[in-house]
C-alpha cells in the first residue's frame, strides 16, 4: 500500500479502500472470501482468496477482472512486484507467478520438483523485484531470487506453522507463527534465529 491509499479485503468479495480522506466499499464482482490484497502502485493490484480466486484491478480498485488460477484451493497471499509481475501462494504447495500482468500464471519450480510439494503457504514478502520469501506449514521457508519462478528451501529450526513474514530491508526479516513462534534473520534468510 501507499502513504495515501489503503486497501483491505474480506468476506464475500468485499474490498474497502481509504484514499487518504475517507473509506469506500469497492465492487469486485466475486462473492468468494478474499484473504489478501496487494497494490504495487495506486492503480495496479491483485486480491486472492478462497476457491482459487485471483482478481486484478488496473484502475485503483474501481473495476476488477477475475484471473485463471488453475486451482480451486485457497490462495492465501499475493505480492505484486511490478505492474506486470506478481506471485501468489496457497494451500497444497501452490505458488504461481506472472510476468504478463496476470494473463498467464506459471507454476513455480519448488524444492523436490516435480514431486508435489505438500506445504501450505500462508505469507509472501519480497525485498526487490526478484528476491522474495514464502512461509508455511511445518516451519517451511522458501526463497526465490528470480521473481518467483524457482524457489529454494531454507532451514528455520522451527516446526510451527509460519503465518507471516516481513522484511525491513534486504537482510533483516521476521517470521511469526503458531504458539508464539517468532524467528528473525539478519543475513537475507541464510540463517534464522529465535
Model regions and ranges:
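Residue-level hotspots at or immediately adjacent to binding/recognition sites across diverse folds
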Residues: 1-194
